[in-house]
């Protein structure tokens, strides 16, 4: 049984999946399993993944029978996971080599069941162009206002929570999971050290922003069950903070919206 189970959904990820897997293989902490769930890819990413599976028994590939979306893919991996800790890494993102070692030490030294970390933003060529710092801790209501937890950095302890799955929505399912966890504990704790790299794809930036807003509203209303007044209150925080981070990052930093 591995100590950490790494959850990676994959769909037509041939362009970046090799470097993503390699970033896991390069970890200084080695007691992990990487569970990749392929969501009916039509490129040759499955063949690429399989080549890694054949080289390292810690890497596992599960193939879905029909295209089902990232939430189903991640939940399938969570169900198959055997590790105490559940970590997340998407198929185009990267971990720095000491990510697991530092973050697990942070959690165990402080008895934290749920943690996250700072990360850099990279472009399609792997060049760093931005940085996302994190607050020391967040609670449920904090996260409704703005999601400070990057999926590629999140880790939770199944000894504390059990296995907790993502809500079955097409977008923002990661935020939905963090909210579920924060109903079971007071805080998630942030390690403000850069431990990962989030890849921003130029072909989907505008669409992602629009979809994120739409599905954030749906998450408030349909998953969290917030009434119209509460949902509007939290959505206004989400929208204003997002606008400040994008259009006025200097002001956002002074206000504590952008670390």
Tell me what each language-model feature is.
Residues 2-4, 25-36, 44, 56-60:
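Short loop->beta transition adjacent to catalytic acidic/histidine clusters or analogous donor-positioning motifs
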Residues 15-18, 43-51, 94, 98:
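Acidic helix N-cap motif at the loop->helix transition within catalytic regions
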Residues 30, 38-47, 66, 90:
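A conserved acidic beta->alpha catalytic loop
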Residues 64-81, 102:
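Glycine-rich, basic loop-to-helix element that forms the pyrophosphate-binding segment
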Residues 79, 131-215, 219:
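Conserved nucleotide-sugar donor-binding catalytic segment
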Residues 86:
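Short aromatic/hydrophobic "clamp" motif used to bind/position activated sugar donors
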Residues 98-129:
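Conserved donor NDP-sugar-binding/catalytic core segment of glycosyltransferases
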